[in-house]
Design a protein with these regions (language model features):
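Active-site rim/adjacent substrate-binding subdomains
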Residues: 1-67, 79-134
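Catalytic glutamate of the conserved HExxH
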Residues: 71, 75-79
Length: 134
């Protein structure tokens, strides 16, 4: 995992995805491309913009730790082949993110619940700690 600021993320996003500006998380799988045989035990790199993560956390009223955990899980799922290009893929990936976070004892950020098409249960919002964790 690599933590970067928005400027560095914008460069990576433009260079590797043709995107404009920063994004929250990028995944670079090692099992693809010219370095796939260097170390088959390494999945790849997950790059997270801490500035974008902080903005997301503030926008939903959550904590930075929960947001960073979500982005790390999201990136790892990309490394092992998950995507969210279609509605079905998105539902499956979001469900897996939620299950993984909960298995780690982390209450998924509100936006994961909202992505599932339902608001979070109010009692879960009140249980969250000061940094967004359950």
């Amino acid at each position: 995992m690599v933590l970067v600021d928005d400027d560095a993320m914008a460069v990576l996003n433009r260079t590797y995805r043709g995107g404009v500006g920063p994004t929250d998380v990028l995944a670079f799988p090692m099992l693809e491309g010219r370095f796939h045989d260097v170390s088959p035990d390494l999945l790849g790199d997950v790059v997270i913009s801490t500035e974008t993560a902080q903005r997301h956390a503030l926008a939903i009223g959550g904590g930075l730790r929960g947001e960073l955990a979500l982005l790390l899980v999201h990136g790892i799922l990309h490394l092992v082949g998950y995507d969210h290009g279609t509605a079905t893929e998105r539902r499956d990936m979001w469900r897996r993110q939620r299950l993984i976070l909960m298995a780690c004892g982390i209450q998924p950020p509100v936006r994961v619940c909202m992505a599932r098409g339902r608001p979070p249960r109010p009692e879960r919002l009140h249980r969250r700690g000061p940094d967004g964790d359950a």
